[in-house]
Amino acid sequence: MLAELGVSDDEDNYTESKSLVAQPQAAMVIEDQSNGYVVALVGGRGTKEGRRTLNRATSAVRSPGSTFKVLAAFAPALDSAGQTLATVYNDAPFNYNGGTPVRNYYKTGYRGINPIREGIRESMNIVAVKALTVITPQLGYDYLLNFGFTTLVEREERNGEIYTDINQTLALGGLTNGVTPYELNAAYAAIANMGTYNEPKLYSKVTDADGNVILDNTVPNSKQVIKETTAYLLTSAMEDVVISGTGTRCRFSTKMAIAGKTGTSSEYHDVWFAGFTPYYTCSVWTGYDNNIGMSTTRGANYEINVSKDLWRSVMKRIH
């Protein structure tokens, strides 16, 4: 599939080495946000045979990292909590309710008073967690359910311990299980579609040998999950991400609006880019199946940039 889209799948580009057991993996979903049809889906690298049959796009649940800032914190804050992109939060030392400090990804200390727009553009952890704390994790969780996520945990007991995703770490994608690229992409497609969520579709209809329709999947299954004005504001802020923020590597055109959000989990176990143009929404996950961190060694094969490079290469090809 990658080769058909004009993207090389070789070890020189993406650091795969046949001498290593652990190999970096990737998954991608592309959807036409206007109707929900999935136009491309990649579940992993290489020919899908033997041990390569796992479809990571639909079956692998991974931490969404900072891609959840927009969905869990900022979307509900703008949509129903009376906040705007100009609402400010202080990027200063801040602890979760349990006392653990919230850490920013950047190592240059804190950046003081910043609006939500800047919090999105620069992917500021403390700003996102503070926003979710104000609007409450319960509201953020409810919005995520409305965005179509099915792998979230409301409350679950495991070996005598209680697990729940209704907490402050939700803002940074800190989940009990994780999400699939398939569902994450559908949520971002809702923003691209001016707040209307379309249940993603992998087929239009199924017919028998005589042409009789057995399954009809052409009827839209859609709902308004955020206001059009909220979608417009989020899109505007995420355009800044691509123009001058954490997603500049994804920019492939100066004539077409491109919006999106980067995402990394702790220790770079999961690296994402979810974004859209006026035509398609695409989400890319990269990481290792055994959950080791992606390499942060700079150079031609800088692994933590692969998700953005794949996104740009494929989206440029299809536009």
Q: Where are the model-predicted features located?
A:
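A penicillin-recognizing enzyme superfamily signal
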Residues: 1-20, 24-32, 40-42, 47-60, ...
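Conserved catalytic neighborhood of penicillin-recognizing serine enzymes
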Residues: 82-140, 167, 209-240
